[in-house]
Amino acid sequence: MSRYRGPRFKKIRRLGALPGLTNKRPRAGSDLRNQSRSGKKSQYRIRLEEKQKLRFHYGLTERQLLKYVRIAGKAKGSTGQVLLQLLEMRLDNILFRLGMATTIPGARQLVNHRHILVNGRIVDIPSYRCKPRDIITARDEQNSRALIQNSFNSPSQDEMPKHLTLQPFQYKGLVNQIIDSKWVGLKINELLVVEYYSRQT
């Protein structure tokens, strides 16, 4: 299944706020209206919607998300927590959380078009897994810095998570540590996502 490129507002009206996909927010009460129209949700649908939230927020294909779930399942610790850490430490998401892009699709474009350096080297793979002590900068070119400055000039998003530090005048971000789960930028029940996939196999 390919990455979603359809109307974004339609998704947030059904699933709630997805800051990685769009900075728009559903109107107050729209969740309640949707629920009353559709009646009581089945457990399957609840798990499916949590999975879809994760997929659309981080801009993943179904295959990519399944791959991350499998990697998380083999790691030590809670599968759900590890899954969120893997997704949050992607380069495209780190750029978004730093405010260097207003959405994750926007961050992905910066990476694909070779505007971003990690530790002084161009990285053009959005799924690159960032590590503690990584230094993320814009290329020293007017076009690259102008794109990021536009994001800095946009209305600010949520508070900067503790695992990141931004130095905006240098167009630089630092990864201080692996993210703590309480700083994940999405309201999600990750256990339902893991349950969804465990019931598919």
UniProtKB/Swiss-Prot annotation:
Protein location: Plastid, Chloroplast
Protein keywords: Chloroplast, Plastid, Ribonucleoprotein, Ribosomal protein, RNA-binding, rRNA-binding
Gene Ontology molecular-function annotations: rRNA binding; structural constituent of ribosome
Gene Ontology CC: chloroplast; small ribosomal subunit
Limits of the S4 RNA-binding domain: 89-149
Region of interest: Disordered: 15-44
GO BP: any one term: translation
SMART domains the UniProt entry points to: Ribosomal_S4, S4
Primary location class: plastid
InterPro entries in the record: Ribosomal_uS4, Ribosomal_uS4_bac-type, Ribosomal_uS4_CS, Ribosomal_uS4_N, S4_RNA-bd, S4_RNA-bd_sf
Record PROSITE patterns: RIBOSOMAL_S4, S4
Complex and partners: Part of the 30S ribosomal subunit. Contacts protein S5. The interaction surface between S4 and S5 is involved in control of translational fidelity.
Family, similarity comment: Belongs to the universal ribosomal protein uS4 family.
Function noted in UniProt: One of the primary rRNA binding proteins, it binds directly to 16S rRNA where it nucleates assembly of the body of the 30S subunit. With S5 and S12 plays an important role in translational accuracy.
Protein name: Small ribosomal subunit protein uS4c
